[in-house]
Design a protein with these regions (language model features):
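Non-catalytic, usually N-terminal nucleic-acid engagement modules in DNA/RNA processing proteins
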Residues: 1-44, 50, 57
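Extended two-metal-dependent nuclease catalytic cores across DNA- and RNA-processing enzymes
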Residues: 12-16, 24, 40-43, 65-240
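A short beta-strand-to-loop transition that corresponds to the Sensor-1 phosphate-sensing loop
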Residues: 48-52, 113-116
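Short catalytic/ligand-binding loop motif for oxyanion handling, primarily in non-cytosolic enzymes
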Residues: 53-59, 119-121
């Protein structure tokens, strides 16, 4: 919203700056939230906001490195503060908004996010038009392990070489016959081992299985029980048991 209503402004012959119409932004945001409320009148809205610190940077230092140096829109901080003060909201130390949502999502909740990564969380997901889609545990797991393989160029982590989003591998019997997390994880590890040479050539990776775990921890949207509230930190994913 802040980017949509940001304008260049000339303050002198040689000086330009940016300004944002916060009132326009608030109108947009409140309108969107009210529309969502109409779609789910029997639910209480809880906004999940990201914390300033992010545990993923310690796991993979190049995480979101492609976004560093990109200026946030003018007024972004003020809008965020206004939302936190005027709506029921949750911020958990050291994790992103997606993680807070994934941790809180229960069987009676509706999940709303435009981020495809949330499809790794089981539950009922709502679209902006009110349409509801249920993501089963199997679908959530399949989406997660697929993300571990494909990586995410927007978030700056590479995944496994030659396994893109549209790779034929995801239509193979090996993939489609996976039902347990152990099945998925063993198959994912196998793909990373097959890519040993390319991983070294492209990323100087000497331990493909360690790198696979690194990618999984970065890709993992935290689920219920995967956060240590006493110490304000996530419980790092360590593979299926």
């Amino acid at each position: 919203a802040s980017r949509r209503h940001e304008f260049e402004f000339q303050i002198s012959d040689y000086k330009w700056t940016y300004h944002t119409r916060i009132d326009y932004c608030l109108k947009d945001l409140v309108g969107q939230l009210e529309q969502l409320k109409k779609h789910a009148p029997n639910h209480t809205q809880v906004l999940c906001l990201g914390h300033k610190n992010n545990f993923r940077y310690a796991i993979y230092p190049r995480y979101k490195s492609n976004r560093r140096g990109i200026r946030k829109a003018a007024g972004y901080g003020a809008l965020r503060e206004w939302l936190a003060n005027n709506y029921e909201s949750v911020i958990l130390p050291n994790v992103e908004a997606d993680d807070a949502l994934g941790l809180m999502a229960g069987p009676d909740d509706l999940i709303y996010s435009k981020d495809k990564d949330l499809r790794t969380i089981k539950g009922v997901h709502m679209e902006s038009n009110g349409e509801l889609t249920e993501v089963t545990e199997l679908e959530a797991n399949r989406n997660f392990y697929k993300q571990v393989l494909t990586g995410d160029s927007c978030d700056g982590y590479p995944g496994c070489p030659n396994v893109g989003v549209n790779a034929k591998f995801f239509d193979s019997d090996d993939w489609l016959k996976c039902y347990t997390e152990i099945d998925f994880w063993q198959l994912v590890q196998g793909q990373y081992l097959l890519a040993t040479k390319k991983l070294f050539d492209r990323h100087q990776v000497t331990d493909p299985l360690k790198f696979a775990l690194q990618m999984a921890r970065v890709a993992r949207i935290l689920r219920p029980g995967e956060y240590d509230h006493e110490n304000d930190k996530p419980v790092l994913w360590d593979g299926p048991s």
